């Protein structure tokens, strides 16, 4: 079977980009799929031109072109991201971290118990808003790094922006839905544990996972390491 030339492969990358596929990882998958199909067509029809074979392969994607593939891939990577969060969160809770969680819960409970219900609500608000400010600054920094990169990666975009920002925007909602009066010590204890657990979850999502993003990308895409040297 005649293999496509490097120039033709680059044409396929340009073709996918022109059809609204901007992530290099997805472009590579589509280019590989298109190239295989085109090579088969050219073998079966030697007189067929490259562009004609390309259009024939593209028609197989239907009226919406690559968009359905893009959406399916995004859904799959979102599921992968949720699995990554779970694994990081699970790995985070070693014995020392469990002890730290208990200590932080007791500390928060003791602090809240020293104040009236209205002040308790204010303390929780300050706690969340402080974390929100720090995390938001970090996400802006990561987003700036993404924009400077030559290639966009869908998983990287999800890792560093979409899911992180989604988690942050849940904080104000969580704050607004909190009860103003917390009189039960049992409920106060549960709320202290819940808030500590939520903050640890956000810490893992905003700080731990982004710091390991390159390792995750290299494991997912072997070509990622190669593109860093280009």
Outline where the language-model segments fall.
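N-terminal, intrinsically disordered, low-complexity segments
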Residues: 1-64
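Cytosolic juxtamembrane regions of integral membrane proteins
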Residues: 48-107
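C-terminal alpha-helix/helix-terminus motif
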Residues: 8, 61, 65-68, 217, ...
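Intrinsically disordered, low-complexity regions enriched in small/polar residues
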Residues: 30, 52, 63, 83, ...
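Bimodal feature
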Residues: 18, 29, 43, 77, ...
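Alpha-helical protein-protein interaction elements
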Residues: 7, 50-53, 58, 73, ...
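Hydrophobic alpha-helical bundles in membrane proteins
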Residues: 86-230
């Amino acid at each position: 079977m005649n293999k496509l030339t490097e120039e033709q492969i680059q044409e396929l990358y340009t073709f996918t980009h022109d059809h609204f596929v901007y992530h290099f990882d997805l472009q590579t998958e589509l280019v590989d799929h298109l190239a295989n199909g085109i090579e088969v067509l050219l073998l079966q029809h030697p007189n067929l031109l490259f562009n004609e074979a390309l259009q024939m392969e593209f028609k197989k994607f239907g009226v919406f072109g690559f968009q359905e593939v893009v959406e399916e891939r995004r859904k799959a990577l979102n599921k992968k991201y949720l699995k990554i969060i779970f694994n990081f969160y699970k790995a985070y809770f070693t014995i020392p971290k469990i002890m730290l969680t208990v200590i932080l819960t007791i500390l928060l409970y003791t602090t809240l118990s020293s104040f009236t219900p209205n002040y308790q609500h204010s303390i929780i608000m300050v706690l969340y808003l402080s974390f929100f400010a720090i995390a938001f600054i970090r996400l802006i920094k990561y987003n700036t790094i993404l924009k400077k990169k030559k290639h966009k990666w869908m998983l990287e975009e999800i890792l560093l922006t979409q899911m992180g920002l989604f988690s942050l925007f849940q904080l104000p909602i969580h704050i607004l839905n909190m009860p103003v009066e917390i009189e039960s010590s049992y409920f106060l204890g549960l709320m202290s544990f819940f808030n500590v657990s939520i903050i640890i979850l956000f810490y893992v999502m905003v700080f731990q996972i982004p710091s390991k993003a390159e390792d995750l990308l290299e494991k997912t895409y072997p070509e990622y390491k190669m593109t860093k040297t280009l």
